[in-house]
């Protein structure tokens, strides 16, 4: 595909929250033609019938949901997005790849390099372990060149995105220790998906904040995998996610130990400059990572509906800790937006296409 080309794309599982966000981004993408959307629940109905907000936008009034069929999908699209639960996505990926179609998978099925780790965290054997060696972890800021040449892209999870982008450059540069990392995340309820589930009903979540998945949330597996790659050694972290009564957004705070002591104001100033330089070198040219100004801290309201991660940090001389905070929209940078960013790299498009 040339830089000026248009690519035909399809979405399997287009009626979920991530699928809906994908539809929104692709309807307005200048070089993507949405040719197929699937949902067993809404077969025969158009996009705008199920999502009235899309009425009058592109093909939304005419494109109908179909039953997911790998043969039909491969015939209709050059690249297929899988917005399906883990365990289900892999079955479609295998057939689509065999048909010569490229796949961007939003599930967890291809994020992990080791099938034994997948089984440990997801409770069942990996459905397509033979594909793991060629799957590329689809975080552009960390794996841009590999994404460009991939057949199978594993779009990262929402929590990992909020944790990895702040921390990976510092580990790689040796500015923080690989031990004792603590990450606490607060997430909106859309992260649980659209399927009705009593713990995530409005009456259960409103006026309430609660932890879940402690001490071994599934996303911990890919977080530790990617941090270990950055550090060049095994990294184990403490991760505690919390559900908060908002629709979308993740705010993550991490507590890290710098490799240098900073017991005096002068030492703190030197370390602060090194941290500033490291993060600037990693992200000053990145379109979707915003390093916030001094005195400004991330706020989920400021990233809602955007593909940006907002990042700030503070040194605490009293405890000897580096505190990093980040905010993302879990459905955009934490899911569909990051997947479209990978599409752009895969096709040689402007990386920001469909994401502004």
Q: Where do the language-model regions lie?
A:
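Conserved active-site and cofactor/substrate-binding residues in soluble primary-metabolism enzymes
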Residues: 17, 134, 158-165, 214-222, ...
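C-terminal substrate-binding/catalytic lobe of Rossmann-fold NAD(P)-dependent oxidoreductases
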Residues: 33-76, 179-185, 189-324
């Amino acid at each position: 595909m040339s830089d000026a080309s248009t690519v035909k794309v399809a979405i399997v599982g287009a009626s979920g929250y991530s699928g809906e966000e994908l539809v929104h981004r692709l309807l307005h993408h200048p070089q993507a033609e949405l040719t197929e959307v699937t949902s067993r629940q809404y077969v025969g109905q158009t996009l705008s019938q199920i999502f009235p907000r899309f009425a009058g936008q592109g093909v939304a009034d005419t494109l109908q949901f179909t039953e997911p069929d790998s043969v039909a999908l491969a015939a209709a699209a050059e690249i297929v997005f899988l917005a399906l639960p883990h365990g289900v996505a892999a079955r479609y990926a295998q057939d689509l790849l065999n048909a010569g179609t490229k796949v961007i998978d939003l599930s967890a099925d291809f994020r992990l390099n080791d099938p034994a780790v997948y089984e440990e965290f997801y409770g069942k054997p990996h459905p397509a372990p033979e594909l793991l060696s060629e799957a590329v972890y689809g975080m552009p800021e960390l794996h841009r060149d590999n994404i460009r040449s991939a057949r199978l892209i594993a779009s990262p999870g929402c929590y990992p995105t909020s944790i990895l982008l702040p921390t990976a450059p510092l580990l790689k540069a040796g500015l923080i220790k690989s031990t004792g990392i603590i990450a606490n995340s607060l997430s909106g309820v859309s992260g649980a998906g659209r399927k009705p589930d009593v713990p995530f009903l409005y009456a259960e979540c409103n006026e309430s904040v609660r932890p879940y998945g402690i001490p071994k949330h599934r996303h911990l597996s890919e977080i530790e995998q990617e941090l270990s790659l950055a550090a060049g050694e095994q990294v184990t972290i403490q991760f505690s996610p919390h559900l908060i009564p908002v629709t979308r957004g993740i705010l993550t705070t991490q507590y890290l130990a710098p490799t240098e002591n900073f017991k005096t104001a002068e030492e703190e100033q030197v370390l602060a400059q090194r941290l500033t330089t490291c993060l600037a070198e990693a992200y000053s040219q990145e379109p979707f990572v915003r390093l916030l100004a001094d005195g400004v801290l991330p706020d989920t309201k400021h990233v809602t509906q955007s593909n940006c991660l907002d990042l700030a940090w503070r040194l605490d001389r009293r405890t000897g800790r580096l505190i990093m905070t980040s905010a993302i929209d879990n459905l955009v940078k934490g899911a569909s937006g990051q997947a479209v960013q990978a599409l752009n790299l895969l096709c040689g498009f402007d990386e920001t296409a469909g994401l502004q």
